Amino acid sequence: MAEAVESPGDPGTTTPRPLFAGLSDISISQDIPVEGEITIPVRSRVREFDSSTLNESVQNTIMRDLKAVGKKFMHVLYPRKSNTLLRDWDLWGPLILCVTLALMLQRGSVDSEKDGGPQFAEVFVIVWFGAVTITLNSKLLGGNISFFQSLCVLGYCILPLTMAMLVCRLVLLAEPGPVNFMVRLFVVIIMFAWSIVASTAFLADSQPPNRKALAVYPVFLFYFVISWMILTFTPQ
């Protein structure tokens, strides 16, 4: 860019003058060094080192994950409105519970491979397909919970039913009869209600107020099917 100035000889004409022409008269006799240091606080570096798990041993990592799973189990056993399962979600607990429940539902017959395989696969299909269906239903109803958070909650809340299956296996060691069935029925009903209460305590606030019933109804069916499998289980 240039700036126009009037020529002293001809008032009607102008001659262009550079915009920064005055800066050429400025000179620096010598270079002025810029000195200084950029320091990083020691505490921040220590925090970053402590929070990093790259240098953590495998044993410490496994123990840390197991402690986190155990804390979530306690939240399910003592259900209350909390965002712990939603904030720190994982799928290790649901996987452990699903495998444990499938192994206990596996029949004891060794004569036919069909007695064990379908039962084990059936539990996996019901648990994961049911959890995915409930999650999609929750999202369609306008819930503000993510996909994996819903899977985490639904999977962890199988814990009471897994405990019911363990009790039923122990009761089935005794002589079968009406008393045996009534004991198993009572245990399954209590644990079924426990799973419903625990899951709704975590998922209720994530649904719109006028659609909570529509979101809870599939959860009821989900745990009812698992409870029915536990109640009708008979070892061979």
Curated annotation (Swiss-Prot):
Name of the protein: Protein YIPF6
Top-level taxonomy: Eukaryota, Metazoa, Chordata, Craniata, Vertebrata
Keyword Transmembrane: yes
Lumenal side: 106-115, 168-184, 234-236
Sequence similarity: Belongs to the YIP1 family.
GO BP terms, alphabetized: endoplasmic reticulum to Golgi vesicle-mediated transport
InterPro entries from the UniProt entry: Yip1/4-like, Yip1_dom
Subunit text: Predominantly interacts with YIPF1 or YIPF2, but may also form a ternary complex with YIPF1 and YIPF2. This interaction may stabilize YIPF1 and YIPF2.
Originating organism: Bos taurus (Bovine)
